Amino acid sequence: MKLFKFLIILFFLNSCSFDNKTGIWNNENKISDDKQNQIFKDFKKISSSIKTFNENIPLKKNFKFNLDKSVNNVSWQDYYFDSNNNLKNFKYDNLNQVVLKSKKLSKYELNDYFLYNNNNVILNDLKGNLIVYSLTEKSIITKFNFYKKKYKKIKKLLNLIVEGDIIYVSDNIGYIYAYNYKINQIIWAKNYKIPFRSNLKLFSNQIVASNQNNDLFIFNKISGNLKKLIPSEETPINNSFINNIVLNENNIIFLNTFGSLYSVNKNNFNFNWFLNLNETLDLNISNLYIGSKVVCNKDKIFLSSKNNFYILQSKNGRVVAKKNFSSELRPIIYMDYIFLITKNNFLLAMNASNGKIIYSYDIKEKVADLFNFDKKKLEIKNFMLVNGNIYIFLKNGNVIQLDIRGEINQIIKLPSTLDSFPIIVDRLLLYLNKKNKLILLN
């Protein structure tokens, strides 16, 4: 019922823009059954099933990529690196020598994501422990647990973001809080009872989060007070996909578990536009929305739904390109190019303006042909741009290094398996292994 009412309201607000010219703000119109049906009709039109892309497209011999120099990154304060959820071309010494291997950081399962701030690695485990490991002292300098005994048996799924000495945390119990790890003190804490289910974003003095009911929250990051609550469609059941929040220059871009993408003005928190990317409104366990993280770059938005990859205009949500392939990994937008690994393991380079494919290669076939590599062992954890090359990190600890043209240079064997999403800071590669130890390579 909540979903039905919400869709009616959204139709009233005009599905692509929110102006004051039509009289809708003065209750001058009522929505008929035909118009209600049109809402559902439009939602279904947005995404249609097409045969999945499965084609090798070689790079034209005369094509030249325009690349900037790699950057020496010095911090990783956001799970997805920055407010745009986009990665850079990182500088890495590429010696692949172990600089540091920590002791076991926790006896409990650690989060796949961790942060880096002021020479400290910040991570958490399922017991709710916040752990700060100093690379200078080569030891844990802070270990803090916010939770009381009554939550002892609950697995705590925490979402972190750090700014200065403050770690901001939301969880699956309904708490959101700010913790100063330098003085070991809670700054503020609020309990909203409903589990939070999204990454966190910071801008100005605000912190943005979302819960499992697909409500979008904007808090004052100094006091923790709620500034704005924006409801959206609620899904009765959830899968592994969680709400995703990304910021561009003027707007909050919010993708919820119903498959709806919203643009919200950062200054007045009004809707700019919305778009539904789900393929069906029949929500059951077999057809729940699933897709990639959203990435913003310049005036475009990039993301995958279950079966399609989209390029959208950030100003109005207009579809610039829709492709018949999809990815669970977020794309990397670099210069004028998109780099993407599809669900069926094709590496693609595309034009970021129009989505035109520059090249497409079956990674499994390339690796198997060159290195007699078992295709079944090619389970991709993540990929990054490093020193102008493409590094594909496999779960078994191998790294496939390709040049920017999609040709394999080598396969690197890491000293241990990969159990987290790797990061690169200060020209070092950092990751957690399956024994909950931090590994640093130069």
Protein language model regions, located:
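Blade/loop signatures of beta-propeller domains
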Residues: Q38-I57, N62-V99
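Short loop/turn segments that connect beta-strands within beta-propeller blades
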Residues: S134-K138, N180-N184, N220-G224, N265-F269, ...
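Bacterial Sec signal peptide processing site at the extreme N-terminus
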Residues: F12-F53
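WD40 beta-propeller blade core
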Residues: I131, Y177, F217, Y262, ...
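Blade-level signature of beta-propeller repeat domains, shared across WD40, Kelch, NHL, RCC1
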Residues: S416-N442
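Loop/turn-rich, solvent-exposed surfaces of beta-rich toroidal or solenoidal domains
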Residues: Y334, L340-M350, K356, Y361-L402
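Extracytoplasmic beta-rich repeat domains
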Residues: N73, Q97-L115, S139-I161, Q185-S204, ...
